[in-house]
Amino acid sequence: NVLLVEREKFPRYHIGESLLPFTFEPLKRLGLIDRMRASAFIKKYSVQFVSTNGKASQPFYFNTRYNEDVAQTWQVLRSEFDQMLLENARNKGANVVENTEVLGLLRDGDKVTGVRVRQPDDTEAEHNASITLDCSGKESFTASRNRWRIRDPYLNKVAVWTYYKGAKRDEGIDEGATTVAFVPEKGWFWYIPQHNDMVSVGVVAEGNYLTRDGLKAPKDIFQREITHNKWIEEHLAAGKSTGDYYITNEYSFHSQYCGCEGLLLLGDAFCFLDPVFSSGLMLALKSGVLAADAVNDAIQSNDFCPSRFEDYATTLRDGIENMRKLVYAFYNPNFNFSDLTNKHPDLAGEVTDCLSGDVNKDYSRLWNAVLEFAPIPDNLPYGMPKVPEREMV
C-alpha cells in the first residue's frame, strides 16, 4: 500500500517547467507518454544560447543525437503536469491525500517509521510505513530539520522571474526551444515558451549584481535586466507581463545523507543544483525510478537497512556530479560552449548528452577538455545513507 501526502490542493503553481530528452523513459514507465503527446504542452526540440549582444547560437537539436521518441520533449505548465502525475498515482492504486501537512517523522530510535500529519479538518494523525520517501522538493523537509542541508560552495545565485503573454516565439520547431540568454557578470535569462500563448522568463545571477544601484523590488530588477540582452528585449516587446514577479535565492544545496533507516530522499529534497540546464525535473523523475526499484527490492526481501540503498545513492550522486561540473564550467568567465566545441568538435555529442540528461556515463574526455578552459569541482563527499552504528559493526 502506498500513501501519498500532499500539503496543497492540486492543481497548484510550481516553477521548473522544462523537460529534458532523458525524461522520456521515466514518463514511459509511468505510462504517461500518450497523455503527454495528447496534451497542449509545447513540444521542445532544442536548446540555444544567446550572447549579450543578442546573437543566437546554432541550436543544440536533440534529433542529431537521439531517435525520434527521445529527441522531442516538452515545455510544461507545472500545475497541469503535476496534476497529471498525481492522477496517475491515484489511478494506479496510491491513496492520495491533499491539503494534508506533514508535521514530523515518526521514529523508533534511529529508524523512521512513518509520518505525523495535520489533516484538512485540522486534526492530527499518524501513518506508519516500512519506508518513508521524502519528496518535499525545495522545502527539503528532512534535510532542513536534521541539519543535513549543505549549501553548494559556489552556486549561490538569485533568480527573479515572471510570465509574459503574447511574447514573440521563434518559428517552426524552434517555437518550443529553451533559450539561455546571457547578461553581464555571467548572469542569464531563461526563456521557456508555454501553451496558452504564455512564456516563462527569468533572470539568474549573483545577488550583488542584481541588487546593484540599490534595486530590491523583483519587478524593478527584472525590467532593468531586460535591457541588457537585445534578444530578450525584442522577444518580450510584443508581450505583456502577467504582473506577478517571483524571487528566490540560495537555492543550491546538497543533503549530507540520502536517508537513514526507514527513510529515503528524492529529487529536490535530496539536492538542487541550478536552473540553468533544467536538470531539476529530470533528476526528480530519475530519482523516482531509482528509488522505486530500490524500495521494491527492499520490500521483496523485507530488508530496509540503509546499506541496501547505497546503489541508489551512488547512481544519483554520480549523475548530479556530472551535471554539477557542467554548471560550474558554465559560470566560469573563461568558458563557453562554442570555444569548447570549436577546439574539440568530437565532443559536441558529449555536451549534448549531458545537457539532455544522460548523466550517468563516463565523461572523462569531456572534463579533461573543459579543464583547458576552466577548473572543475571535485565530487562532494555527500549523499550516502546514514548507517546506524549497530549496522557498521
For the regions a language model picked out, list residue spans one by one:
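FAD/FMN-dependent oxidoreductases across multiple families
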Residues: 209-294, 300, 304-311
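Glycine-rich FAD pyrophosphate-binding loop
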Residues: 1-15
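Short beta-strand to alpha-helix junction loop
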Residues: 65-88, 211-217
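Predominantly flavin-linked oxidoreductase catalytic cores and closely associated redox partners
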Residues: 87-236
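Helix-loop-beta segment of a Rossmann-like dinucleotide-binding subdomain
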Residues: 57-76, 114, 204-208
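C-terminal helical "tail/cap" subdomain of flavin- and related membrane-associated enzymes
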Residues: 293-393
